Amino acid sequence: MSSKIERIFSGPALKINTYLDKLPKIYNVFFIASISTIAGMMFGFDISSMSAFIGAEHYMRYFNSPGSDIQGFITSSMALGSFFGSIASSFVSEPFGRRLSLLTCAFFWMVGAAIQSSVQNRAQLIIGRIISGIGVGFGSAVAPVYGAELAPRKIRGLIGGMFQFFVTLGIMIMFYLSFGLGHINGVASFRIAWGLQIVPGLCLFLGCFFIPESPRWLAKQGQWEAAEEIVAKIQAHGDRENPDVLIEISEIKDQLLLEESSKQIGYATLFTKKYIQRTFTAIFAQIWQQLTGMNVMMYYIVYIFQMAGYSGNSNLVASSIQYVINTCVTVPALYFIDKVGRRPLLIGGATMMMAFQFGLAGILGQYSIPWPDSGNDSVNIRIPEDNKSASKGAIACCYLFVASFAFTWGVGIWVYCAEIWGDNRVAQRGNAISTSANWILNFAIAMYTPTGFKNISWKTYIIYGVFCFAMATHVYFGFPETKGKRLEEIGQMWEERVPAWRSRSWQPTVPIASDAELARKMEVEHEEDKLMNEDSNSESRENQA
């Protein structure tokens, strides 16, 4: 069915692509990634767009003091929209291309932001956040795949990790905007903050006219000339004879030939015997990322710091520091993910996060006292103001937890889920499925965390600590290493059922040509093709004579 849809829309898709190509393109891979990963910045704007306001008096008064259940649904409504957006993304991305999907992402985001900025009641706020969420869902499913398809293999991890960096940058920018605008009395504070969300959406929308289409998608549409030109301009300043370019084109051809010779690919294919292990690995990678508890820190940090004894501006300032930590620590992570590998970072990160979750639970459990008159039923405990050391210990656990996440699971999962398939035929749909799992867990965590704080307070962190232990165990036994491996190697590793803990040192049973060997082979084939074309042209001229 999916292949039929792609064939039906192939003509219109190429016309749309021609229209998008009217403006000159920029082929610097970092510029391209910076435009596409604005979708990640929008994801970040979503995460912190509520954080600075949920404890503010004017917010509580305007929305009639929403209880833990209502506030949970308001916060989580964007994740609900993102779930549906991520599922729908492949129905646009496959037949119409990656750029149109990013344009769709920007459109929904801007419409949702406009609705939020003109909010009159809770229902309108929820509707606006759901619509923006659809856009974020499109972007979170498409942008990592688009980056992986365009990036040279040697910096694939870096380019893939830029998505998470832009997420953290968006979180920080939005929180500080909200913090500054929070000094305005009345509803203008959050109206302006939510209206400013239109800016990154507009930048993404306009930027899509200056970046090229995915060469793999173009090749699939039979546009080989355009595909080769894009690969050459990105990897070799336009030199089509460059070995890296020849290797990349060869890999694309091999993948498409394999796709032509196989049965139709759809969502059901992901759950066949060949792919089901990869599918569940990618799904659990996204599930575990949410179950670290990171978004509890992002969405409800103001609540957490109230429990630690902070209030007013001191709460917001202390809260903002973790967003700076999140952004700054992500930068070296982009480098180390290609040096250290995926597995060591994920296992080490889960272990550290477990320790800090248990540490935070222990401090709050030991030193907090009941706080029945807090004015917020989600915050019913508090460390006394005279116990500064306990407060600082709780805050330190939060900061160290955020740093541990940013350096490991924050960057690592988006890179890993784009690589793990080892087969471009299923990568887009697989990424859409795994990303939808991320969003449904995001929704559940944002929805039920206030209720968890209300009913079990500090014990909530014990639950997330246990999840961190479980994910470290799962990564060790179930997540193979993908660092430095070509798509064919990753696919072969799955087919040979290599144990995850042996994947780092694994060598292909069926030898795969080295880059140098493949380059020599491609050069020979390229010369043979040129000679055949010359012979064909000579015969044609002789016949005409």
From Swiss-Prot:
Membrane topology: Multi-pass membrane protein
Listed transmembrane segments: 29-49, 72-92, 100-120, 125-145, 157-177, 192-212, 291-311, 317-337, 345-365, 395-415, 433-453, 460-480
Highest taxon above the source species: Eukaryota
GO MF term list: carbohydrate:proton symporter activity; D-glucose transmembrane transporter activity
Residues linked to a glycan: N376, N387, N455
Keywords, comma-separated and alphabetical: Cell membrane, Glycoprotein, Membrane, Transmembrane, Transmembrane helix, Transport
InterPro entries: MFS_dom, MFS_sugar_transport-like, MFS_Sugar_Transporters, MFS_trans_sf, Sugar/inositol_transpt, Sugar_transporter_CS
Gene3D superfamilies, A to Z: MFS general substrate transporter like domains
Outcome of gene disruption: Reduces the binding of human FH and C4Bp as well as of human immunodeficiency virus (HIV) gp160 protein onto C.albicans cell surface. Reduces ability to form hyphae.
Transport keyword on record: yes
Expression induction: Expressed in presence of 2 percent glucose. Expression is induced by progesterone and drugs such as cycloheximide, benomyl and chloramphenicol.
Pfam families given in the database record: Sugar_tr (PF00083)
One Gene Ontology CC term in the entry: extracellular vesicle
SUPFAM superfamilies reported for this sequence: MFS general substrate transporter
Subcellular localization, as worded in the UniProt entry: Cell membrane
Disulfide bond residue pairs: none
Subunit composition and interactions: Interacts with the human complement factors FH and C4BP. Also binds human immunodeficiency virus (HIV) protein gp160.
Family statement drawn from the similarity comment of this UniProt entry: Belongs to the major facilitator superfamily. Sugar transporter (TC 2.A.1.1) family.
PANTHER family (UniProt xref): MAJOR FACILITATOR SUPERFAMILY (MFS) PROFILE DOMAIN-CONTAINING PROTEIN-RELATED (PTHR48022:SF7), PLASTIDIC GLUCOSE TRANSPORTER 4 (PTHR48022)
Function: High-affinity glucose transporter. Acts as a multifunctional complement-evasion molecule that causes down-regulation of complement activation by acquisition of human complement factors FH and C4BP. Also functions as a human immunodeficiency virus (HIV) receptor via binding the viral gp160 protein. Modulates hyphae formation.
Record's protein name: High-affinity glucose transporter 1
Organism of provenance: Candida albicans (strain SC5314 / ATCC MYA-2876)
